[in-house]
Amino acid sequence: XXPQQLGHVKAAXSDY
């Protein structure tokens, strides 16, 4: 759930 920046990919509102 929360907006997380995974390395170079921004996952907004995603748990991935």
Curated annotation (Swiss-Prot):
The keyword RNA-binding does not apply. GO terms for cellular component: extracellular region. GO terms for biological process: defense response to bacterium. Plasma serum. Keywords: Antibiotic, Antimicrobial, Secreted. It is found in: Secreted. Antibacterial activity against Gram-negative bacteria. This is Salmocidin-3.
